[in-house]
Every structure is written in structure tokens, then in C-alpha cells.
């Protein structure tokens, strides 16, 4: 949606001018290069992700919540704002026991490893 509104966005050249080629990486790469439209996309993405994470924490109160997928390779560009929003929005923000939010260690191999373990 933002790309359609901003035809001069760097995101277009990063995805070869085809909207269907745009990924989360496209937005993060363009944001790091100073593209304001991409920065808005990343901010919106992080806010939606934080909403889901906060809901999971508030409902299930897990000790650890793992986040996976390719977007986790963005490191602090993803985690710092995500953790700040989650900390401010979760019900248990003043509790001694806080949910640890971690990047899944298996990365993009998690699905295939899980499928292999299922057959055992």
C-alpha cells in the first residue's frame, strides 16, 4: 500500500519494480538507506508484531517467547522498538517475572527440523 502511494520510494528499485517481489527485507533495506516510506512500513510492521506479542504474553504469560523467520535477521532494527513497545503495553510490566523474548536459534530451518522430529 505504501509503495503504491510512494512511486519514488527506493523499495521499488529493490524489488525490481514489481510489488509482488517486495518482502520485509525490502522495507528494512530501504529504511536503512533513508527511505521515509520504508521507515513507515517498518514502523507499522513492528507495531502489528508487538500487538501480537503483547497479546500472547498477556493471555498465556509464558516464560519465554521465541520469534522466528527471516525478519529476525534485522537484529536491533527489529528488536529494540519491538521490546520497547512490548514492555510498555504488557500487563505484567511491573512484575518481577518478565517474559523473555528471544530470537529462535534454528532460524529458517525450524520447520524442516520440526517435521523431521515429528516422524520420530
Per-region residue spans from a language model:
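ATP-binding/phosphotransfer module of carbohydrate and carboxylate kinases, centering on a glycine-rich
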Residues: 1-120
